[in-house]
């Protein structure tokens, strides 16, 4: 948050005519059992969500004055190169290590019942580019696919791409006490106003993510 503050203050002091994009998160919203649009009530329930909301508030203060600030609110994005602290990248990295006998054939997971709106990170970056070019300053935009996937199905899809037999173990340490059961976005605004749509099929994203980790493990 302080880094965002210092950056915006520096840009303002230098009187630069520039557009600034502050990557936000769907975790600024209150939990919902339906698809979330940008007018859904704000109410983060995690420290991370609070920090992203604080960044937005700093940015909006500047957007109300002289700077052009863009506010994407990304739902779950994934893809090759993502840190294995995230669920799908963790699944893929564990499978890759099992394939090379680096670890026993057991995948440790958190909740597999959660439903998540998943967007390929490459589509997410394309959304950021489009917003920098055509987005309205101070206006939030959901970056999402509009489709929810159960994490158990995502894991099953990854396992279908390997020949190894794997056991799945629920690791209590990976369960998050304040995790939302459903996190689904409504992309209508960014679709209509910016012309951006999530294009990459989940199967392609999962394949590329698993192949990325196969390459990493073999190094």
Spans of model-derived segments:
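Catalytic helix-loop patch of NAD(P)-dependent Rossmann-fold dehydrogenases
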Residues: 1-6, 12, 18-19, 27-71, ...
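Residue-level signal for the nucleotide or nucleotide-sugar donor/cofactor binding architecture
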Residues: 2, 46, 82, 86, ...
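Active-site beta-alpha turn of Rossmann-fold NAD(P)-dependent dehydrogenases/reductases
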Residues: 21-25, 45, 73-75, 110-113, ...
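NAD(P)-dependent short-chain dehydrogenase/reductase
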Residues: 34-35, 57-116, 121-130, 148, ...
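Mid/C-terminal beta-alpha module of Rossmann-like enzyme folds, strongest
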Residues: 91, 134-175
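Core catalytic loop region at the nicotinamide-binding pocket of NAD(P)H-dependent oxidoreductases
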Residues: 102-107, 128-143, 166-168, 217-219
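Conserved C-terminal active-site "lid" loop/helix of NAD(P)H-dependent oxidoreductases
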Residues: 121, 140, 153, 172-201, ...
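Amphipathic terminal alpha-helices
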Residues: 202-219
């Amino acid at each position: 948050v302080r880094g965002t503050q210092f950056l915006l203050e520096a840009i303002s002091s230098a009187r630069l005519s520039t557009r600034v994009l502050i990557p936000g998160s769907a975790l600024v919203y209150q939990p919902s059992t339906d698809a979330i649009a940008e007018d859904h009530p704000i109410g983060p329930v995690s420290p991370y969500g609070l920090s992203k909301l604080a960044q937005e508030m700093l940015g909006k203060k500047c957007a109300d004055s002289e700077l052009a600030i863009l506010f994407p609110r990304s739902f779950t994005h994934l893809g090759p190169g993502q840190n294995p602290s995230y669920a799908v990248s963790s699944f893929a990295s564990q499978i890759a290590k099992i394939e090379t006998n680096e670890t026993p054939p057991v995948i440790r997971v958190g909740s597999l019942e959660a439903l998540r709106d998943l967007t390929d990170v490459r589509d997410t970056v394309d959304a950021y580019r489009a917003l920098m070019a055509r987005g309205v300053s101070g206006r939030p935009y959901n970056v999402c696919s509009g489709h929810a996937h159960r994490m158990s199905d995502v894991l099953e899809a990854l396992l279908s791409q390997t020949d190894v037999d794997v056991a799945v173990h629920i690791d209590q340490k990976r369960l998050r006490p304040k995790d939302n059961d459903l996190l689904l976005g409504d992309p209508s605004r960014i679709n209509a106003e910016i012309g951006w749509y999530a294009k990459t099929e989940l199967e392609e994203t999962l394949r590329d993510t698993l192949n990325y980790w196969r390459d990493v493990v073999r190094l």
